[in-house]
Amino acid sequence: MQKIVVRKEEAQKREFKGVSLDSLAVGEKSMVTKMNYVKGNFATTHRHPHEQCGYVVSGEYRLRVELEDKPIDVLLHAGDSYAIPGNTPHSFEVITGGEVIDVFTPHREDYL
């Protein structure tokens, strides 16, 4: 049964490729995660079938998204957000550690 409310202390804590993350709400088709980054964390260029929408709570990050018509290379700061379509190559580098909230649709089994 799907959990409607997840209290802070109930969040499932995981480590994925050296990054600490909390699996927060998990719905039927999507999930919310809180990524806890430290300076030097990175994700090399990769793709996954999940749409990924994120909100930068704190820290500074370099996001690269390889769109066919125009590649994007941008610095993200607190308050910025992004939406990466599924199966789109992208990479992520942590400049200053902090927290990012990500929503994945469908949910990522490797984060559960």
For the regions a language model picked out, list residue spans one by one:
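A short, N-terminal "cap"/entry segment at the start of jelly-roll beta-barrel domains
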Residues: 1-30
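Short hydrophobic/aromatic-rich beta-strand segments that constitute the beta-sheet cores
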Residues: 33-34, 63, 102
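Short acidic-glycine-tyrosine-enriched beta hairpin
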Residues: 68-86
